[in-house]
Amino acid sequence: MTSLPLGVKVEDSAFGKPAGGGASQAPSAAAATAATMGADEEGAKPKVPPSLLPFSVEALMADHRKPGAKESALAASEGAQAAGGSAQSLGVRPGSLGAPDAPSSPRPLGHFSVGGLLKLPEDALIKAESPEKPERTPWMQSPRFSPPPARRLSPPACTLRKHKTNRKPRTPFTTAQLLALERKFRQKQYLSIAERAEFSSSLSLTETQVKIWFQNRRAKAKRLQEAELEKLKMAAKPMLPPAAFGLSFPLGGPAAVAAAAGASLYGASGPFQRAALPVAPVGLYTAHVGYSMYHLT
């Protein structure tokens, strides 16, 4: 309440003074009025104790005085060191983020950079791939996730007739020897021991060679004889119609055929007989004999 009379007195003194001194005292009066108004506003605002401010000196000092302040400070410093180490492992310097305009020294080329890849040899860039053993992770190799590899089936071995290891080579007979052997075989198919010895010496052959040749020639003659007999049997068979047509003929001559036809058309013999339907013969001995099923000799 003391500011109001002070302001009034200042104004009265200002207006009461002569014009020469009022011009010099006007700024000082305005400043005093502003100071009094600011003091009133500060008195009207509620004052906050300095201990409640988070960034005050008391608050900062109180944090250091707490029992767990040292542990928290150590943890913070360790976290900062770990962050700095990770930044260094990633190739980022601590001052590079804060000062982007600062000139940076060229970093060494890594294996995964463009320069590092260009400097690698060609063998390192090309990965060796093996079709037989592809790379697999351990969980893929377990039978739970991947089926067992299919076994390669080897091609079946060719089953050829195996000859004896101690088999003698085949005897190459000359043309003169073959003609003499054929002539002797036509005369006599079986030779005695004396005849075979004499004949083999005349052809400059051993007795075993002559013996084996005669055995083979007799087997060949037997096969040829059986083939000739089969041909004769096939030629002797009459040309009969196939059984698919089912043609059958009654036994007897033309008279029997005519009688059978009349009996099928007319029931009994007589002057006045009506036509009857043909009835198939029933019985074992009344049926016709089919040439398609039996060969008559």
From Swiss-Prot:
CDD domains: homeodomain (cd00086)
GO cellular component: nuclear periphery
Name of this chain's protein: Homeobox protein MSX-1
Segments of skewed composition (Low complexity): 24-38, 71-91
PANTHER family in the record: HOMEOBOX PROTEIN MSX (PTHR24338), HOMEOBOX PROTEIN MSX-1 (PTHR24338:SF8)
Record's function text: Acts as a transcriptional repressor. Capable of transcription autoinactivation. Binds to the consensus sequence 5'-C/GTAAT-3' in downstream activin regulatory elements (DARE) in the gene promoter, thereby repressing the transcription of CGA/alpha-GSU and GNRHR. Represses transcription of myoblast differentiation factors. Binds to core enhancer regions in target gene promoters of myoblast differentiation factors with binding specificity facilitated by interaction with PIAS1.
Pfam families tied to this protein: Homeodomain (PF00046)
Crosslink position(s): Glycyl lysine isopeptide (Lys-Gly) (interchain with G-Cter in SUMO): 9, 127
Gene Ontology molecular function: DNA-binding transcription factor activity, RNA polymerase II-specific; RNA polymerase II transcription regulatory region sequence-specific DNA binding; transcription cis-regulatory region binding
Primary subcellular site in the record, as a coarse category: nucleus
